[in-house]
A protein has these predicted regions:
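Electrostatic, structured charged patches in enzyme active sites and in nucleic-acid/phosphate-binding
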Residues: 1-163
Length: 163
């Protein structure tokens, strides 16, 4: 499966391990999108040779938002201070971000908070922002991510809890 970022791939590995441990289930990558606003048009009168015609003139594109992951959590995850906010029925929606998701060249750093608020206001669903490096420190880093090409533990993960 191709992921949009290395952080999404890391989080999918975490989810796979967490599923084996009974902490999560029903994992879906890129579930159905939330339709937040339809395309906007305005009526405009166009003069033809012999008559006038009313047409829809394009004004704004539709806006939708697609989370990176959705899954169910069980009580077994409560041993960790994971910070995930579930919706009803313990469903968790997640958008995965890198450590440095800021900057004016990263569109997601601007659009995500707006979409997050909009989804919550319209559907009552909270989208959790997960930065794997921070999330792994609170929970665990999957062992397979800690080993580099040389077979040694990567310095990046040396102080993290490993499972």
């Amino acid at each position: 499966m191709g992921f949009d970022s290395v952080e999404e791939e890391w989080f999918s590995v975490w989810l796979r391990i967490a599923k084996k441990r009974g902490m999560v289930d029903g994992i879906i990558y890129h579930p159905s999108s939330f339709k937040l606003a339809p395309k906007q048009t305005i009526k405009e009168e166009v003069q033809l040779k012999t008559k006038t015609k009313i047409v829809d003139k394009f004004l704004l594109h539709p806006h939708k938002y697609t989370p990176d992951f959705v899954f169910y959590i069980s009580n077994l995850i409560s041993r960790y201070d994971h910070g995930l906010v579930p919706c009803k029925d313990n469903i968790v929606f997640v958008d995965v971000k890198g450590v440095y998701a800021g900057g004016r060249h990263n569109n997601s750093s601007i659009t995500f908070p707006i979409s997050q608020k909009w989804v919550y206001a319209k559907f009552g669903i909270y989208i959790n922002k997960v930065v794997p490096e921070k999330f792994f420190r609170k929970t665990f880093v999957p062992k397979e991510l800690t080993i580099g090409k040389s077979g040694k533990v990567l310095k990046k993960w040396k102080d993290y809890p490993v499972f």
